[in-house]
Amino acid sequence: MASLLNIRGLSVSFGGVPVVRGLDLRLEKGRTTCLVGESGSGKSMTAFSIMRLVPEPGRIEAEAMLFDGDDLLKLPEKAMRSRRGRDISMIFQEPMTSLNPVLRIGHQIAEPLELHQSLSRKEALEKAVELMALVGIPDAAKRVNDWPHQFSGGMRQRVMIAMALACSPRLLLADEPTTALDITIQGQILRLLSRLARERDMAVLLITHDLGVVAEAADDVAVMYAGELVEQAPAVEFFARPLHPYSQGLMACAPLLGNHGAHRLPSIPGMVPLPSELPEGCAFGPRCPHFEERCRQPQLLRETAPGHSVRCWKV
């Protein structure tokens, strides 16, 4: 299957300090890839680099970042700006801070339609109503004139999805889209994203730290730690046989996934290292129960089974 997005050797740094290191990632049409890891692992910065929205003084470097054959890092800024929202769209973490509190919901959904599709305000608002209905907002024709504060957290997140889908993007980046939502609404949003990915033949990169979200939504899983990809596999294979010690630790810490009964959940000791204080060799080494001397040497991401790669000497 041809990749919609093919990233090779992506690195992001600030003042010479790397926050993403040599990342390779392929995203396929109609599939949802979950990028999982603790806070500080480089997940969000990976998404921002795809959008070319890494804040200054951040520096993006890569062998290639091919989107449908075009290298995004070589596009002029004007050409990249036209890609954002039209071909590549993003759902941000906090819908209340991402929505403009002094603009009606309909106008915010209509804006990318007016910009990228040259629709009139009337036509764009009519399309906004259709999009609101598509993402499950009831009474869309009435609510299109409401303000952001009149929507619940779950409904605001649906508005953000409607905005992201307005121009029918081929790639959707979703950065922790369900973090602030209760478990019922979270499930609804995840099922909605998965359904839209299939129906629209759209590639989705879903960023999360929650393996429950991964189990609900993922076709493929990519695990990041300290700026590196440490494991990548189809979701079914990943949950059946996680190989990297970090992946195994995350699984053991997840309720209902690797732990049963009334016992206290285990935790992974220590913290993700600061980008400026990375250890030699395996970045997970200081927290790993299987650490040995050779783990101080650099390790490559190796394929251990079709589609399943891991960065660990022990595998």
Regions found by a protein language model. Give the residues of each.
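Hydrophobic anchor residue at the start of the ABC signature
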Residues: 109, 161, 185, 189
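Conserved structural motif at the start of ABC-family nucleotide-binding domains
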Residues: 5, 20-22, 83
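Charged, flexible cofactor/metal-binding loops and thiol motifs
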Residues: 234-315
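ABC ATPase NBD coupling module
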Residues: 54, 59, 72-89, 107, ...
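Conserved ABC ATPase "signature" region
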Residues: 71, 123-142, 248-252
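P-loop NTP-binding/switch modules centered on Walker-like glycine-rich loops
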Residues: 38, 173, 177, 181-263
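A short, proline-enriched helix->beta-strand linker immediately N-terminal to the Walker B motif
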Residues: 166-170
